[in-house]
Every structure is written in C-alpha cells, then in structure tokens.
Amino acid sequence: MSGSSFGSIFKIATWGESHGKGIGVVVDGCPAGLTLNEEMIQTFLNRRKPGQTKYSTPRKEDDLVTILSGVFEGKTTGTPISMMIANETARSADYSEIASFYRPGHADYTFDAKYGFRDYRGGGRSSGRETIGRVAAGAIAAALLKELGIEVFTYTKSIGPIQIDYHKCQKENLTLSPLCMPDLEASQKAEDYLEQCIHNLDSSGGMIECIISGVPAGIGEPVFDKLDAQLAKAIFSIGAVKGFEIGSGFEVAKQLGSENNDGFAFDANGKLIKLTNHSGGILGGISDGSEIIFRAAIKPTPSIKKEQQTVNKSGENINVSIKGRHDPIIVPRAVVVVEAMAALTLADLLLSGMSSKMDYVKKIYQK
C-alpha cells in the first residue's frame, strides 16, 4: 500500500491496523537536539484515546507510547524516530459478521474495489486508530514549533446545529468540556443534542477550527506547494474530514473585493499588520504573519445502530444495524488529530523554507 507517508523534509510514515498488534510511526528529518521524551508525546495521545467520556467509543485502550529509536538522554539525535503504541483490547469477534457485507459510510467497498481484499476487523488500515501515529508525530512537530514561538490551538467549533464563536471563548475551558468546546454553555447544549442522537441510534458530525499564531511571514512555497494547499492536503488525509476552508472560506463567494481584501497598516511600533484577516493568514500560498485560521468539517460516525440499507457478497440487498463499540461523534477526539497534522505541515514547510534566502544559508554555513 502506497500513500502512508507525509512530508518532504520533516517526514512521517505511519503503519499498523485497528486490530493488529500495534500502531506506529517513523519520523525522519527532525533536527538533532530537540528536547523530547515519552511523557511529552503521551500528553498528545491522551487527548485522542478512546473510552474517556460517554461520547467516545467504550473501547478502552491505554495507548501508551514507546520510543524505539532516535532519542538519547532526552534529546533527538537527528536519526529516524520510531514509536509504537500497542493495541491491547481489540475484540475482532465484534466484526466477524461484517465480513460478508459493506458498511454504509465506510471504506469497506472501496478497499475491496482497489485491493480485492480487506481487513474487516474495525476497518483495518482505514480505521480511525491509524491517526494514533499521526498524533505521536504531531507531538514532536509541536515541540519543534514551540521552540520557535509558534502555537497551534484547535477546538470543537460546532456539533450538529450548536456552534460557538472563538472570540467569545476562554481557552482554559477547553479541558473542562468533554467535547473540547471552550464555551461551556454551548458544550452542555451539544451534550443534550448528542443524547438525542444516541437515543435515536444515530450519530452527529461537527466542525473543528484551528488557529495558528506566531508563524512569521514568508512560510510556504508558491504554485503547487502553497501553504494553504499543503494544509488542505494534510487535513483531508484524515478519514472523517469532508470539508476544508481557510479564512473566510466559502463566504468569499458572497463578498465584494472591497469587503474581502485585507488592508495593511503600520502599528504604533512600525510593524506591518493586516486590518482584517479574511485570507486566514495566507496570501499567494505564503504566510503573511497574521494568525492562520482554518476549519475542517467532520462527518458523522458511520457506524450506527439505526438500520441502514446495503448489500452483501451474495448479491442481496439487506438491512443492517452496526454492532460493536463506536463513537456517537468523532469530532472531540479528532481535535488533536487536526492539530497534529497542522503542526506537521508547518514543521515541514519551516524546515524546507530555510533555503529560500541566501541570508538564511549564510547564517548556518558562513565562517
């Protein structure tokens, strides 16, 4: 299977299946000397692991990371960093029935169409557990970005019809909400909405917003490797994502040029600033120094107990109700996955951008 790697300089390759012995990732291209330990990575993994709230799958996994290589005495060595997380509570028997039919909304049919074979146990490689490797790698990228004063903040913007405004939220409330929704009043309304979904044997989708601050102007490559194009690729590679927009996004189709253009000015300290941020912090595929803001639309969990129509391998039309342990909503656990992919994208482009000016090269190599 191709397509399991991401990045050009700061590169990752994930491996493993939902019900295999473990999930892992290899990170290549991380500079030597970055402070790193398993606890730092575990903090990220704990944000996505299952079974922590009533709104995530009851499958209990500790998701404990083991660093196998690339770190010595708390510092990265510059060699590939290999990490593994064991699958400890897989219940493959829950999935034996689905070997004979295609689950609506899943990749069962398309994997069969491409490979003529599929691992039906929890979706195999197409399972959401694949994102564990991304999150572990993203923790390393986030540590690198932190050294440069760059912060990636990601949260649940909406669940079903319940939507919040970032500017009216308090970041510290993020960990107080089981849904990663920093507006606690809205979070409670979203919980009530999810209770209705569960009662109706259904699931819900939602939206995740990411705000990246501290990115200097000049990051990203024009034409095919634009910063916004790379972010879109990264976020769309997450299985549950079905939509992506940056800045004002699809609203720009309704705006006039005079409304959409972001004016420039100098602040009291003589620093160039933008008066608005409809562009989402990117112009011409290159960061402009303001906050990078994007949103990802997450589809409802496809595994639901409500009866749905499908077909089996005997050529029959059938009705199915999906059994097993599944999230009524993917969004809260996907928040850190989106954050990880954003961090990986920025880390890769920052490192590749070091050769864009002769001044940068001289700072490193001139004697």
Curated annotation (Swiss-Prot):
GO biological process: amino acid biosynthetic process; aromatic amino acid family biosynthetic process; chorismate biosynthetic process
Molecular function in Gene Ontology: chorismate synthase activity; FMN binding
Cofactor note: Reduced FMN (FMNH(2)).
One Pfam entry name: Chorismate_synt
Recorded metabolic or biological pathway in which this protein acts: Metabolic intermediate biosynthesis; chorismate biosynthesis; chorismate from D-erythrose 4-phosphate and phosphoenolpyruvate: step 7/7
Coiled-coil annotated residue ranges, if any: none
Membership in a protein family: Belongs to the chorismate synthase family.
Protein name per the record: Chorismate synthase
Gene of this entry: aroC
